[in-house]
Structures are given as C-alpha cells and as structure tokens.
From Swiss-Prot:
May catalyze the synthesis of indole-3-acetic acid (IAA)-amino acid conjugates, providing a mechanism for the plant to cope with the presence of excess auxin. Induction: By auxin. Belongs to the IAA-amido conjugating enzyme family. This is Probable indole-3-acetic acid-amido synthetase GH3.13. The keyword Protein transport does not apply. Residues 9-18 have a biased composition (Basic and acidic residues). GO terms for cellular component: cytoplasm. The keyword Ligase applies. Keywords: Ligase. It comes from Oryza sativa subsp. japonica (Rice). Its EC number is 6.3.2.-.
Length: 469
C-alpha cells in the first residue's frame, strides 16, 4: 500500500467548509473539502484533485483529525481520555490534536467492542459518534468466533463513492475507449443480520450495492455494467452468478473490461461458467433465463429484458465453440474479445491466484485499482498497468486519519512493535509498519494490515514482499 508524499504548500486548512460542495479542481492555495465533488467524466480535474490531496497530505491529515475531534470529543468514548477540562485547555486544533495523540490510546478491536455491542443492542450512537450510526459493517476478521462489527455513518457512503469516482479517470490515462461499451463486473451481495436494536449488520460491499449511491447512480458509460442491478442484488448467490454470466455472454460484443472485487471471486465465476456454459447457451438461444434455474422473480425479469433483445442462436453457437474447445487457456479473451483488462485485487492473499488468472486471461493485464477494508476505504493504484508483483497503492489522506507503528521481526520471525507512533508523512523508507486508523467516528484502532514504504510517495502491501515504489 502506498502513502502520500509530504506537503509542499502552505497550510490553508480553513479555506473551505468541509460540508460545502466544491468542484473537483483545487488550487495549491486551498484544500478541497473532506469529501470533494468529483465528476469521473472530468478526468483532468480528478487527476488534479488527486495531486492536491497527495502533495498536501500533511495539511489534509491535520484537517481530518481536526474534524474528527470537533465532531466527537463529546462522545462517551473520547470523553474517557479527553474530558471537558482537557478540551477547554486546548487553545486550538493543534493543541487538541496533540492531546489526542498523547491521551487517546491505540487500541485493538476488543477494546472498542463493548461500545459497538451496546449500540447494536440499542444504546445511543453518542457512545462513540456524534453522528447517527446507520449500520454496522461486518469484517472478514472474527472476534470470539463472530464477525467483527465496524460502526458506519451515512457519510461513509459518500466517501466510498468519492473514491470509486477516481478509478476511471486514472484508468483513462492508460487505456482508451472505456466509454465505448460496458464492464462485466461480477458483483454479489451477502446475507445480512438485524441486531437487537433493529440495526442492520452486513459486509461493506453489500452495504454499498444496496445503497442509493449504487442503485441510483447517474447513467454513465463508466458505470454501465452487463449485469442489471436486480441480478447483482439477488440474495441467492448461485442464481446471481448464473444471471450475471448469462447477461455478460449475451452482451459479449459490448464488454470492454471484466472483473470482480477479488481474484478468487472472478475465478469462481470462470469455474461456474465451465460447468454451466451449455445451459447458458441454451438460454441465449431461447432468449430467456431458465425459470427452473433463476427463480427470483426480479432477477429473472431483469435478465429476460436483456435477453429478449438479443435472442441469437449464432451467438450461442459462437460461445459454445469457444467453451467446447480442447483448452480453456485464454478463454476470457476469446469470449470477450474487446476486453482490455481484468479488474481484480491480486495483492496480499489474492496473489496466489495470479497464475490461474494469467492462464484464463490469455495475456490480458491484471489490474488492482483500489485498496479498502471494513474500517475505511484507503487508496488507489495510480499505475494500474504495472505488473501485479509491483502494485503500489496510494493512500488518500482525506479518507481517514492514518498513523503507523514500526515493527521488527524477532529471532522467531514474530513481529515486535517499537512503540513509537508516526503519522502519514513520517514513515521511513525500508521499515515495516502496522497501520493505525482513526475513522470519522473517533476510535484510534490498530488495523490488521502491515505496510512497507517503498518511497516518499508510498507504502506497499503485503509486508513480506518488497515492492519497488
């Protein structure tokens, strides 16, 4: 993962109200708001915005922490460490930030878990946040055998949308014509639970796909997918997979990019296709989804609307000819010949799938565009066509407040912290770090991610593999 570079411009933290709308462009003399307006169709403005955020990382980070503290010093959690007397004695934002770093401990999830569980059971959000907690995001990590729960506010969806809006402008620097077709992205929702208080707990991607930010997104060639939303939102993952592949094959000639969030999910789709291509071809010939397979009414109706305009026996025969061949080497490129790249995360634990992706992809570039977790969305890949083993993510300093704890390996290979906490622009090239994240709800929690700085511009992941910045 990469961090951002040190700032080179004077600080103007108060030039804009963080809640006011602003264009994506920003001059060196003014910081953009915390969630800037960002039009993915205006590539130059988006790239300029990235430049402003990253070159002025220190100023942006100071503003993030100031906003976090301005909002949350009255919460039960922060009042334990920053009481009224401490807040009153702080003469300004810098003094309050210093008190935060001195008095608020870096904790593990287990330390804030009791607060989150109380909110899940009906306690007010003000235990940890000045803004209403609207949902709980489940993490892939566990605590006591149960998924970890991360509190989230409505504003977090705005932050995620902002980061998503930056991805296409970056890709457009390297790949032309992405507005001339569709993306075949295989996206899925997972089961959610309702807590005792009635609050929903669900995975971060499920939260986003069910939000108005995704479902009511503006029509754009960059967010035009082969899958109708009803297929993505189908709660039955098997039906969803079948329906999305069916639409992707039916719209074969329009597909310019393919992908899923993780490499493993994309490969599951390829394996599913390998076992079901005959049935999928039969549905394309018939111009409708088999009602015995796609039983979800909304999903089937949306898929049938796609197929009705494309009932094409010749297309089915062409797909069958590719799938029925002696080898599936390069099958992705052969089935979707206009495809320019495969968009999946191939860093960290997903790196093990690179050989299979290369086998099925037939030479298509493997692109990891972003890095995120349940705590926060962190950063983007500014050199997306670099080989997978050289991927570097650039942390966006407006997404949360970042700190780092240097770690060393002892004689047994175990990590040992040195105790010193440094901020985003204070990391040293060549050292390993654990990430500490303070989100806009105010907890200063050690994240399960390790980072390795590759240059003054960033940190890479995973920590056990050197990445050249």
């Amino acid at each position: 993962m990469t961090s951002t570079s040190s700032e080179n411009a004077p600080d103007h933290d108060h030039d804009h109200d963080a809640s006011s709308p602003a264009p994506a462009t920003a001059t060196a003399a003014a910081l953009p708001p915390m969630i800037p307006a960002c039009d993915p169709h205006d590539g130059p403005a988006c790239l300029e915005l990235i430049e402003v955020l990253t070159t002025r990382a220190a100023a942006v980070q100071r503003r993030v922490l100031a906003e976090v503290l301005a909002m949350n010093t009255g919460t039960d959690y922060l009042r334990r460490f920053l009481g009224d007397e401490v807040v009153a004695a702080a003469g300004g934002e810098d003094e309050l930030a210093a008190a935060f770093k001195e008095r608020v401990p870096v904790v593990e999830y287990e330390d804030v878990k009791p607060y989150i569980e109380r909110i899940a059971n009906g306690a007010p959000s003000s235990l940890i946040s000045s803004k209403p907690i609207t949902e709980l995001l489940t993490s892939s990590g566990t605590s006591g055998g149960q998924p970890k729960l991360m509190p989230a506010t409505e504003e977090e969806l705005d932050r995620k949308t902002f980061l998503y809006n930056l991805l296409v402008p970056v890709m457009n620097k390297y790949v032309e014509g992405l507005d001339e077709g569709r993306g075949m992205y295989l996206l899925f929702v997972k089961p959610e639970i309702t807590t005792a208080s009635g609050m929903v707990a669900r995975p971060v991607l499920t939260s986003y796909y069910k939000s108005r930010h995704f479902r009511r997104r503006p029509d754009s060639p960059y967010t035009r997918y082969t899958s109708p939303d009803a297929a993505i939102l189908c709660p039955d993952s098997r039906q969803s997979m079948y329906a999305q592949l069916l639409c992707g094959l039916a719209r074969r000639g329009e597909v310019l990019r393919v992908g899923a969030v993780f490499a493993s999910a994309f490969l599951r789709a390829v394996k599913f296709l390998e076992g079901h291509w005959r049935a999928l071809c039969a549905d394309i010939r018939a111009g409708r989804a088999d009602p015995a397979v796609v039983t979800d009414a909304a999903c089937r109706g949306a898929v049938d609307a796609v197929l009705a305009a494309r009932a094409d026996p010749d297309l089915a025969d062409a797909i069958a000819a590719e799938c029925g061949g002696a080898s599936w080497r390069g099958i992705v490129r052969r089935l979707w010949p206009r495809t320019k790249y495969i968009d999946v995360i191939v860093t960290g634990s997903m790196a093990q799938y690179i050989p299979l992706l290369e086998f099925y992809g037939g030479g298509l570039p493997l692109v990891s565009t972003m890095y995120a977790s349940s705590e926060s969305y962190f950063g983007i890949n500014l050199r997306p066509l670099d080989p997978p083993e050289e991927v570097v993510y650039t942390l966006l300093p407006n997404m949360c407040y970042y700190e780092f704890i240097k770690v060393e390996k002892d004689g047994d290979g175990e990590k040992v912290r040195d105790g010193e906490v440094v901020d985003l622009v204070g990391v040293e090239v060549g050292a390993y770090y654990e990430l500490v994240v303070t989100t806009f709800t105010g907890e200063r929690v050690c994240s399960p991610f390790d980072f390795f700085p590759t240059s003054c511009m960033g940190l890479s992941t995973p920590s056990d593999r050197k990445i050249n910045g």
